[in-house]
Amino acid sequence: PICAETCPRNPAMEQVLHRFTSQVDEKYSHIVGRFRRELTHPQRTQETELGNLFADIFTRSLGVDVMLIGSGSIRAEKLGPIVTYGDLIEGFPYDDGVFMFKVTGQQLRQMLRYMLREEAYTGHTEFYQLPSTLRLRYDRRKGDFDYFTYCGREVGKEIGDDALFTVGLQNYHFKNIESFFNISYDTLCKIQKPRSVATSCQDILMEYFREHEMLDAAVDGRMTILPSTAQTG
């Protein structure tokens, strides 16, 4: 049996373990960011506060027109107002890189229309959080957009078929782009060969958190789905 007689204490080993666990605790309890308030991500098949914040951070940090964040990669239902390293890697655990590619306005519209098909609302496909540069309203009954606008260059301008956009996508999602967006790698290469623009999503977030305090985000209607997923999901 394991007891004090058969397994006497080893003070030297206890000291080593204590030092190790203290270092681990210090690393994971280190504060990496501060929000103005707690931000939420209650459901992955709808626009969320955390999803909006992350999509905007990556879009700005990487200098792309549109960053599409896999909604399922945000595992936390809430985060903040104090964000520790442990909170971040638990809430956004997949430390993937990012690929950038170019698409036309017509292709971007087709990609997001495919993303918003009916299977998305039952959890059978991936869903994406959008940056504030995009604003759209999708009508599930007709399977198309009421409007699909880009606000980065001209506010409220309807996206033309021939317009070109740089899009960022996490590596895992890029490798599965045909399954998730119904567009092939070969099709993307006809405009420009996709390339890696970042190796660590977590590093991008932490760097942005260091440079910007008291961050906030709101569900601002950038992605409106009718009827809403709350009514039907």
Regions found by a protein language model. Give the residues of each.
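Catalytic centers of hydrolytic enzymes
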Residues: P1-S61, D65-G233
